[in-house]
Amino acid sequence: MKIYLVGGAVRDALLGLPVKDKDWVVVGATPQEMLDAGYQQVGRDFPVFLHPQTHEEYALARTERKSGSGYTGFTCYAAPDVTLEADLQRRDLTINALARDDDGQIIDPYHGRRDLEARLLRHVSPAFGEDPLRVLRVARFAARYAHLSFRIADETLALMREMTAAGELEHLTQERVWKETENALTTRNPQVYFQVLRDCGALRVLFPEIDALFGVPAPAKWHPEIDTGVHTLMTLSMAAMLSPQLDVRFATLCHDLGKGLTPKNLWPRHHGHGPAGVKLVEQLCQRLRVPNDLRDLAKLVAEYHDLIHTFPILQPKTIVKLFDAIDAWRKPQRVEQIALTSEADVRGRTGFEASDYPQGRWLREAWQVAQAVPTKEVVEAGFKGIEIREELTKRRIAAVASWKEKRCPNPAN
C-alpha cells in the first residue's frame, strides 16, 4: 500500500498558495485493508475513506470509463492493480494531475509542473470531453487563477467549444451549474468565468439572459464601453473589488438584464430597463434554483439601481418609500448591499473605474437618519394601529428632508 497527496493541495503548494483541503490516493490496497486500518468508508459510487484521526479523504486509486451521457455517466474501476499514473490520467487538468509521495517527491506524468510555470490550464487527455461539468470547472479555474495570469490552452478551449456545440452541456443539472457558478462568483475575478463561458459558447446555453446583453449598445456619453455585455462584466469585476459578498456580486451581475429586452429600434436608450429586468432575474433564478435571499436582492437591484444614481434629485418621501420597498426596516443590510451594487454599476465603465460615488454615501446617511426616528415616541404620543405606521413615516420623511437640505440639496432648487 502506497499513499500519495494529490490534486489541488499539490498544485497550490507549488504555486505558493495556502493549502486548504488535502486529498489522498491509496495505491495497492483493498477496501477491507482500509477498514482494517481504521478508516471509515464514505463513498458509495467508488471507495473513499476518512482517516481515523484527520478525517481527510483517502480514495483508492481508480479509473473511469464513459458508460452513459452527462457528467454522471461513468463506470469506476478501483482495485489494487490500478496505478497512480492511471488514476491521475482521469483528472481534468494537468495542473490537477500532480501527486507527492511521503518523501516529498513530485510525481508528474502529464507535465503539470510545466503548465504551472507556463500559467496554462490544459486538459490531461481526450477523456476531458466526456464530462461536460469540466467546461464550467475550467472556467472557474480561469477565474480563480486570473490574478496569476493563467490562461486556457488553445486546444483545451477548442475542445470546450466542441463539447458545447455537441450539446453536452444540456446534460448538466441546474444545481451543478449553480454550484460551479456560486464558487466562481466568490473568486477574485468572477468576470473571467463568464467571459470564458462566452468564449466557448456555453454562456448562450447556460445563461441566455446574460449572453443576450452582448452586442446591445448603450449611449456612449454614459457608457464609453458601449456594449452592455462588456459593461456587465466590468461591473462584476468592480463589485468583486468592493465586496466579498456573494449577494452583492450576483445582484450586480443581474442588474442590467432588462436591457436585453429593449427593441432594437429604441437602441441605445433603455428606458424602464430596471423594472423590465425583474422578470428576467426571476426566470434565471428559478431555472438555476438560486437561493431566495440572493434572488430577492438581485430583483431589488435590477429595479432600483438607476433610482440610486439620481439621489440628489429624489424627494425625501421617495427616499423613505425606497427603504420601505427594499424592506430595510427588517433587512437593514440591504441598504449597504444596494449602495455597493450601484457604485459598481457607475464605476464599471471605461474611464470611470476610479470615480467617486457620493450617492452611496448619501443613501447610507439617509438610512441612518430615517432609522433613528424612535417608534417608542410615536406610541407614547397616543397613536394606535395603522396610525403608528403613518405617523412614523411622516416623521421619517421630515427627518430625511432636514438632513437632505444640509447634506444633499436638490441641485434644481
From Swiss-Prot:
**Which residues of this UniProt protein bind ATP?**
G8, R11, R91, R137, R140
> Which cofactors is this protein said to need?
Mg(2+); Ni(2+)
**Taking every annotated instance into account, which residue ranges of this chain make up the domain HD?**
228-329
The EC number(s) attached to this protein equal: 2.7.7.72, 3.1.3.-, 3.1.4.-
Q: Does the keyword Nucleus apply?
A: no
Which CDD domains does the record associate with it? HDc, NT_ClassII-CCAase
Q: Which HAMAP family match?
A: CCA_bact_type1, CCA_bact_type2
Concerning its family, UniProt says: Belongs to the tRNA nucleotidyltransferase/poly(A) polymerase family. Bacterial CCA-adding enzyme type 1 subfamily.
Q: Which PANTHER family match?
A: MULTIFUNCTIONAL CCA PROTEIN
Q: Could you give the domain comment from the record?
A: Comprises two domains: an N-terminal domain containing the nucleotidyltransferase activity and a C-terminal HD domain associated with both phosphodiesterase and phosphatase activities.
Q: How does this polypeptide assemble, per the annotation?
A: Monomer. Can also form homodimers and oligomers.
Q: What is the name of the protein in this document?
A: Multifunctional CCA protein
